[in-house]
Amino acid sequence: VRVSGDGGNYRNTTTSATLPFMSAAAEIHSPPPIPAFRLSSFYFAYYAALGAFTPYWALFLKHRGMDVAAISILMSLWYATRIIAPTTWTTIAARSPRPIRWLRIGCALTLASFAAFVLPMQFTGLFAGMVLFCFAYNAVMPQFEAITLSHLPGRSERYGRIRVWGSIGFILVVAGFGPLLDGIGIGALPWLMLPLFLMLLGSAAITDYARAVD
């Protein structure tokens, strides 16, 4: 940048040689882009599946022949695993050289364990399946929240616009699955939920922690 004078009038002039350096400096100090679509798609899939599970799963268990006592035990596993799964999973991930791998493992276990529910099962099989499924499903969200926040240093106002897609997915499924299941039967619930868990795994596969910026 030069300062030149002409008849007492001074102005700043930028030479072409300085432009590359100014551009490089701007790139160094500009924050990396936020992968909003990838982050939003995970929230959408996770809470869309939750929108199917929360109101309709007990009805599915009743359809499978479970009585009220059995349903209460099976549904309690969802809340019991919420106590231990997040802490256990995030601790394992934090000690791993590649913590993102554990998010993907958790989503794969969620999909695989849930897929077993399309098979005919008695109480013992349903109990074992629910333990594994609920543990994996409850484990992944706290880790994903950490991933989301790693992309938002100094830009926390963007969190709400990303997280809202979880609420949208939940509302769409809760409202849409009711009439759909009335028409095709509650027995189809696992088949309707499987694509949502597949979407969850796909989103985890393309998501990672933000890279550290020097």
What are these regions (language model features)?
Residues 28-82:
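Helix-loop boundary and gating motifs at the non-cytosolic
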Residues 44, 113-117, 123-141, 147:
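Hydrophobic core of transmembrane alpha-helices in multi-pass small-molecule transporters
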Residues 84-98, 181-182:
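Helix-to-loop junctions at the C-terminal end of transmembrane segments
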Residues 97, 119-124, 207:
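Helix-breaking motifs and short loop linkers at transmembrane-helix boundaries and internal kinks
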Residues 101-115:
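Structural signature of the two symmetry-related core transmembrane helices
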Residues 188-205:
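Symmetry-related core transmembrane helices of the 12-TM Major Facilitator Superfamily/SLC fold
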Residues 205-214:
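Flexible cytoplasmic inter-helical loops of multi-pass small-molecule transporters
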